[in-house]
Each structure stands twice: as C-alpha cells, then as structure tokens.
Amino acid sequence: MKKNIKVALVHDWLVTMGGAEKVLWQFHLLFPQAPIYTLVYDSNCGHGMFEDCDVRTTWLQKIPFATKLYKNMLTLMPSAWEQLDLTEYDLVLSSCSSCCKGIITRPDAVHICYCHTPTRYVWDFYYQYLKNASALKKLLMPRMIHKMKIWDQLAANRVDYFISNSNFIAQRIKKYYRRDAQTIYPPVHINDYPLVQEPDDYYLLVSRFVYYKRIDIAIEACNKLQRKLVIIGGGDEEKKLRAMAGPTITFAGHLDDEEMMQYYVHAKAFLFPGEEDFGITPVEAQSAGCPVLAYGRGGALETVLDGRTGLFFTEQTAENLMECIQRFEAQGVEYDRTHIRQHSLSFSEERFRNEIQCICEQFAFT
C-alpha cells in the first residue's frame, strides 16, 4: 500500500442514523484521519456518533433549517457538490443514495462509490413520489426530474468504480447508469445477546417512517389479526401511522442500539413489508435469532432464507402479510434461533471493512 495517500469520505447528508450512515461509520474506522464531506450535518446524528470526526459541509448548511428542509433542496444539490474542491485527495470514497457521486475529483484521483441505490426519486420510485406529492409539486416535478435524470447519468460517469450493496442494486446501476458494479453487502452489527428460545408475544418492525417502507401494511395486518406489534423509529409519516394504529400497536420511538436489540431478541418475528435495496434490519433481526417475515422482492431475497430463517409474502398487501403471519404461526421456520443467528454472520462489520479495504488497495493503492 502506498504511503501518504490522501483520502476523503463523501456522504449525501448526515442528519439521521440509518444503514447508509452505518456504512459511512465503517469507512471512518478504515480511514479515521479522512475528512467527511456532506451536504448538511446535524451533530445529534447517531446520538453524536460523528461529533469527533472532521465533518465538512457545503454552503447548503447555511440555509436556515437546512437539516430539516434538505430533502426539498434537490435542484440545489448538484451545484453544491460540484463546488466542493477535492483536488488535494488521491482517493475519494463515497457513500451514495442521491447526488454525492457527482463530486469532481482530480483526473488522476480514484473515486470509488458505494452505491446504496440509484437516486430513488429520479428513477424507479419517481411515480410513487409523484403520486403522494402536493398539487404544486406535481406541476413542477416532471420538468425538474427530467433535468435531474440527465445530470444524474452524467454524475455516474464521474465514478471510477461502483460498489453495490446488493445484486438487486447492481442490476439497477446497470439499467440506469450502464455501469457494472461489484456487490459488497453492507455491515451489520452482529449482537452477542443471549438468545431466547421462547420469545414474547409480539411482532417487531424497525424503520424510518416513510411511505416506501410500507409500515401501513404491517399496521393494517396486525390490526385485523389483533396481533401485538412494536414499531421502533420515526419520521414524516408518524402522524398518519399513529392515526391508523389500533390498540395492539405500540410506538416505541427512537431507541439506542442496546435497547433495540432487547426488542429484537424477544420478538416472535420481525416484519419487513417494504421493498428495500438491501435492508439491514432483517439481518439485525436474524443476528438476534429472530425469524423474518418479508416482502419477497429486493434485497430481502439475498438476506433471508425462505422457510429456514424466515418466510416471504409475494404481494405487497395487508392481506398477503396476514396470510404470511398465519402461516408462520402454524408452521414456524426450519432453523432454530441459534442457526438463524449463524446465518447472519456472513454480513458482519469486520467482513465489510476487509472487503472495502481490498477494493481500495486494488484500485487506489497500487
């Protein structure tokens, strides 16, 4: 490995803690001296997890309430990223689900992009976003998104090497950007809590409260079946979801990792009704020995073993999830909780760091 290589880390925005931010944290552990460039930054992200890091923001940070309104700044993001001067760095490692792949590097520098997904609201989820948009946004979005699609493809061409977080996303990268990508599964903290063989009588869901996660399906299914459901997380749709929840639904809010793992360990099963690019939470659940009942599309097909560590439902409806819950209660899954945890070991944080380091050594340090 060459010495004196200057490395920069790049991330779309650093506001809430999710799977993408956990990837960024592993990048930081690999390159602790590297600054982190991001559009906007909330120092409370991850309970202050990044407060000792060298975090550098764009001019968007100066806009009042930027950490609340950043999602409405889509048309400003390309300019903000392109104005960053990264010419002093030999290697740029980006964690991208939006626009940060569009940073401009030195001609002889290497930009490795860990792509969580091609920009959702520009490509495959565009019509879902449009369907739920206000009248004004419905009027403005088509022309705006058309321009963003052109820029997004240009931005993808600036990347030297793509890494995808699943084979599912590698296919999307190929479709929208016409680029190949190597799959490296995201890091998952494999908990070491003692397993319980007799779980408590509740189902669990851990998620941000946004539409495409389809938490509404889980609530409707558990309402109709009168099953206990604990929901951990928060977000834009919280008011709507609370309004539809019946007496068997509990909202636990945002919890730290230790509190959350207690819920994973004791849950009867984990519900995963959304179509995700990868989906870290089902692996976290399996690391606690908890079976997963998942919508059978997207990344879940690569992390859950149907019939062994969980069950799939094939239609994204409350009725289909209800049938899956009833099937699980009638027949269970093949693996016991110890073997379910063993399956999760192939997604560990150490494995992730080793694979990322190998890529960096191959493309940037030779």
What are these regions (language model features)?
Residues 271, 291-295, 304:
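Short hydrophobic beta-strand element within catalytic cores of glycosyltransferases
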Residues 239-261:
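Nucleotide-activated donor-binding/catalytic signature segment of Leloir-type glycosyltransferases, i.e.
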Residues 131-162, 170:
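Membrane-proximal helix-turn-helix segments that form the acceptor-binding/catalytic region
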Residues 306-307, 311-318, 326-333:
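Conserved acidic donor-binding segment of nucleotide-sugar-dependent glycosyltransferases
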Residues 188, 194-230:
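Conserved donor-binding/catalytic core segment of Leloir-type glycosyltransferases
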Residues 265-277, 290:
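Acidic donor-binding loop of glycosyltransferase active sites
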